[in-house]
Amino acid sequence: LNEKDIAADAAQACKEIEQGKLLVDSGRSLIEAGLQKTRSLAEEYVLRAKALMTDYAEPRRFELACHAYEQGIELTRANLSEEELAKSLFEYGCFLQTNKRYDLAEVRYRENLDICQRLAAISPYAYEPDLATTQNNLGLLYSDTQCYGESEEMYLSAVEIYQRLSVVDPRVYDPDLARTRNNLGNLYRDTQRYGESEEMYLSAVEIFREL
């Protein structure tokens, strides 16, 4: 090849690169638009679920609301991030727990817990608060279903996380630490471990007084 041919090929290569960049940019825009649409649709499923629960004339309102939540979760699972999936699972778990469907709530919380543990291993400060919140809710769930050993395990794990976080930002995390210790105090009281119950209550009261 002579110099002229090389220059022509180089110009063509540059042109192809620029065309490729345009396609990539266009593709990114389409992907981002699709993700935003998916987020909106997932949120619409949640809003539908909440609206269904206010329709007291509908005998199947709970079943229909669950279906709407599950549709939103599967849409999120297929298209969005693990972080967004974890949030959807947590919200559905709270809904089920509030409606005393503890078996179903446990399944969703446990899946959320697995995701939060993976994310927290990579970025503790970003995801440990969500992990502790799920553990606290599971502690409440297990306490309500008389699974006291599992409840204590979850509460203690949450307390450990909140203690670390409160050292960094007490204003934000001291209330969570106090509430979880109070929940642990309730658990020890219900299982007649009164000395440990008193210890947890007193530590919670001390934190609340300082808020």
Predicted regions and their residues:
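Long, domain-scale regions corresponding to catalytic signaling modules most often appended to membrane systems
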Residues: L1-L41, D55-E58
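TPR-repeat structural position
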Residues: A7-A10, G20, E58, F62, ...
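Residue signature of alpha-solenoid helical repeat architecture, marking inter-repeat boundaries
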Residues: Q36-E43, E63, L80-E83, I122, ...
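Conserved alpha-helical positions within TPR/SEL1-like repeat arrays
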Residues: V46-T54, E83-T98, P129-D144, P175-D190
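Conserved positions within tandem-repeat grammars
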Residues: R118, P124-Y125, P129-A132, R164, ...
